[in-house]
From Swiss-Prot:
Keywords: Flavoprotein, FMN, NADP, Nucleotide-binding, Oxidoreductase. GO terms for molecular function: ferric-chelate reductase (NADH) activity; ferric-chelate reductase (NADPH) activity; FMN binding; oxidoreductase activity, acting on metal ions, NAD or NADP as acceptor; protein homodimerization activity; riboflavin reductase (NADPH) activity. Its EC number is 1.16.1.10. Homodimer. This is Ferric-chelate reductase (NAD(P)H). The gene is feR. Optimum temperature is 88 degrees Celsius. Its cofactor is FMN; FAD. The lineage of its organism: Archaea, Methanobacteriati, Methanobacteriota, Archaeoglobi, Archaeoglobales. Catalyzes the reduction of bound ferric iron (Fe(3+)) in a variety of iron chelators (siderophores) using NAD(P)H as the electron donor, resulting in the release of Fe(2+). Not active with uncomplexed Fe(3+). Also reduces FMN and FAD, but not riboflavin.
Length: 169
């Protein structure tokens, strides 16, 4: 199978957040999409090994920050290559608390969306969380960061827990 074909699928790059038991969690994700408009539902797909996955499962809510094209790699790395349980990802980061209590990262974000989980779907290594939007806000008029930009312009790597990770042969 030519795994390069999967790299041709277009994705955005987002920070998915949640809070459980007083601990804020956040991670980079590329699998975020709108499902319906009435009611407005979005889905996020998170690896079961990630702290953010567990926080969403426990709290029943999540936030999504749509990243701008100019997001620095250091900022992406802060949320993409460290566990929330081992590093305070939100120290020094601009964010606000949403209606459900989840942190919404506003720094380098074009928009933020907040949702309450209405359904979960186990897809093996990951869980697809379907959420009904409770709030959304456009923060600035800027180009959004895509997964292709992350790889081509920023020379970003794919973590082992990503939905699009394939082991090298």
């Amino acid at each position: 199978m030519d795994v390069e074909a999967f790299y041709k699928i277009s994705y955005g790059l987002y920070i998915v957040t949640s809070e459980s038991n007083g601990r804020k969690c956040g991670q980079i994700a590329n699998t975020v999409f709108q499902l319906t408009s009435k009611p407005v539902q979005i889905a996020v797909c998170l690896n079961k090994e990630n702290d953010t996955h567990n926080a969403v499962k426990e709290s029943g809510a999540f936030g999504v920050s749509v990243l701008e094209l100019e997001t620095p790699m250091e900022f992406i790395g802060r949320f993409g290559f460290r566990k929330s349980s081992e590093f305070e990802k939100f120290d020094g980061v601009e964010y606000k608390t949403g209606k459900t209590g989840v942190p919404l990262v506003t720094q380098h974000a074009v928009a933020v969306i907040e949702a309450k989980v209405v359904k979960e779907c186990d897809v093996g290594t990951h869980t697809l969380f379907v959420g009904e939007a409770v709030d959304a806000e456009v923060l600035k008029d800027a180009e959004v960061l895509t997964y292709a930009d992350y790889h081509l312009m920023k020379k970003g790597k794919t973590p082992r827990t990503a939905t699009v990770y394939f082991e090298s042969k």
